[in-house]
Design a protein with these regions (language model features):
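A structural detector for beta-sheet-dominated domains
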Residues: 23-25, 38, 43-45, 57-59, ...
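Glycine- and charge-enriched low-complexity intrinsically disordered segments
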Residues: 378-381
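Beta-strand-rich assembly/attachment modules of structural machines
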Residues: 1-135
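A broad, low-specificity signal marking well-ordered, structured residues that form hydrophobic/aromatic
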Residues: 54, 75, 96, 110, ...
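Short beta-strand and beta-hairpin "edge-sheet" elements
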Residues: 83-112, 199, 344-374
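Charged- and aromatic-enriched interaction segments used to assemble
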Residues: 104-238
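Acidic, small/polar-enriched beta strand-loop surface segments
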Residues: 1-29, 188, 212-364
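Residues that flank catalytic or metal-binding motifs in active/ligand-binding sites
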Residues: 94, 194, 202-204, 240-242, ...
């Protein structure tokens, strides 16, 4: 969760002022100019390639080369919380580039995307070899070429000092940083090879962070009186994997790393994969565990060079693919400090509290409510 004072957090359910601040810059964020905000909304979404997106209308801004344009202009948004007898507390609501600009009667309407879009658009003109070097140094080069001078944050738990072998980046700079496949179908991605994820946060900083899990600390409790609509529960098995097999293969004929295995070993879980689906796949039949279903996923990357690294990736993949079939949608009072990947505790019904991981939490700037989409682990009924 973004920094927020205890007083502001406690006042979210009360009558508070919700001012909005918008700023624009044409020099990469070295200087900022205030803009008159009309209306708009922000969509933080962990499942989107750009973690933050927004749509806003600005009133009578300057236009053209020295004003707001769709080529060089970057936009910063802030949601304020006005607690009585205290100064307004400003919470970052995203640092954006302009995807689309439309002239309106009162000013301009803007569709905005996070700074990932700059990196995504800066494709390599020719294939290039990156490394061998540490993950931090490889990421610094790829990010710095697209966003000169941009800081990179490495959250605790991400092993940025991991040595990576030389690898070829065909075109897609963002895939080389986050994850994907090259033109030959080989898995790439510095973050994926570390069992991590990468995104531009609400302040515009490119961030490498561990894949969030429900074991992370709870950042906010949402009692029933904070909800403005009845929670809606939903289940689907789309994207469910309860056994991951991870290997490292450079394709050069050298020894293959792994395989590393990770599976759901909790007998109380609906997605339980059995006591050992690798060494003893017949155990569920022998033990009468007729409800066990194994769903296997595989990941191979030339950037995985040690057994420990393969183990980390397998655990991260498992954490990200379990529980996606159990989700909760609800509308609550707006907490602009909430980030995708945060773990919250929700009072689903009277006295029944559940841990949920925030996937998305869109809200109207200046509004008092937000719509949350979450997921959680499933347990046997």
């Amino acid at each position: 969760m973004l920094p927020i004072s205890p007083a502001a957090l406690a006042a979210l359910g009360q009558a508070t002022r919700r001012p909005v601040r918008a700023q624009w810059s044409n020099d990469g964020g070295r200087t900022w100019t205030d803009a008159r905000f009309g209306s708009g909304s922000v969509t933080p979404d962990r499942t989107a390639e750009c973690r933050y997106s927004a749509s806003v209308e600005l009133l009578a801004p300057p236009r053209g080369r020295s004003g707001i344009n769709s080529i060089t202009t970057e936009i910063r948004l802030f949601q304020g919380i006005g607690v009585p007898r205290r100064d307004v507390e400003w919470i970052p609501a995203g640092w954006y580039v302009i995807d689309r600009l439309k002239q309106t009667r009162l000013g301009v309407s803007l569709d905005l995307l996070g700074r990932e879009d700059v990196i995504r658009g800066a494709s390599l003109p020719t294939a290039r070899t990156v490394g061998p070097d540490t993950a931090k140094e490889c990421a610094r080069v790829l990010v710095g070429e697209a966003l000169p001078g941009a800081p990179i944050a490495w959250r605790s738990g991400v092993k940025g000092s991991t040595a990576l072998p030389a690898f070829v980046v065909d075109e897609d700079r963002w895939a080389a940083l986050s994850g994907g496949t090259d033109t030959s179908g080989v898995s790439t991605g510095i973050a994926a090879s570390l069992g991590a994820e990468v995104y531009a946060d609400a302040t515009g900083i490119v961030t490498f962070a561990p894949v969030p899990t429900l074991a992370d600390p709870v950042v906010w409790q949402i009692p029933r009186h904070f909800a403005t609509a009845e929670p809606s529960e939903e289940e689907t098995n789309e994207g469910l994997v309860n056994l991951w097999v991870v290997t490292g293969d450079s394709g050069s004929g050298s020894a293959t790393v792994g395989p590393a295995y990770a599976w759901d070993d909790d007998p109380a879980s609906l997605t339980y994969a059995g006591p050992d689906p690798v060494a003893d796949p017949l155990a569920p039949q022998r033990l009468g565990l007729h409800g066990v279903r194994v769903r296997t996923g595989r990941y191979t990357s030339p950037l995985v060079t040690t057994q420990g690294q393969a183990d980390d990736v397998a655990q991260a993949k498992l954490a990200d693919s379990l529980g996606v079939q159990a989700s909760l949608s609800f509308t609550s009072v707006c907490n602009p400090a909430l980030e995708p990947g945060d773990v919250v505790e929700v009072e689903v019904s009277e006295g029944r509290w559940e841990r949920h991981l925030i996937d998305s939490s869109p809200y109207a700037l200046g509004g008092v409510s937000m719509a949350c989409q979450t997921r959680t682990s499933t347990r046997r009924l």
